Regions:
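Conserved functional hotspots at enzyme active or ligand-binding sites that engage polyanionic ligands
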Residues: 1-104
Length: 104
């Protein structure tokens, strides 16, 4: 599991208000912290909302958004399947958005 990989994860029902318990996410944890039991992820969605904290991306032919305002820790056992990796331009945009979102 590496930074910028896109995974299908099993959502924790107590924290999610949707019926489907699977979702796409991008790993945002730096690779140096991969020895931890959980990783930080940013969920992905195809629903558009005009929010500055959403990063536009195309993945597997579908236009979507990475929700940096929804970053959360997920235990490694919840990761189901790796689907691929973000393009380098999207990786840069994602890092820029996270830095701006958490700027002081």
């Amino acid at each position: 599991m590496k930074r910028f990989e896109v995974w299908v994860i099993m959502k924790i029902p107590e924290y999610v208000r949707v019926v489907n318990n699977l979702g796409l996410c991008v790993i945002v944890t730096p690779d140096e912290l991969n020895n931890l039991t959980s990783l930080l992820v940013a969920p992905m969605t195809t629903s558009y909302e005009e929010i500055p904290s959403r990063v536009s991306c195309n993945f597997e032919g579908a236009k979507g958004f990475i929700m940096t305002d929804q970053i959360r820790a997920v235990e490694k056992h919840c990761f189901i399947k790796k689907l691929g990796e973000l393009e380098s331009g999207v990786q840069v945009n994602l890092c820029d958005c996270i830095q701006e979102f958490f700027a002081y």
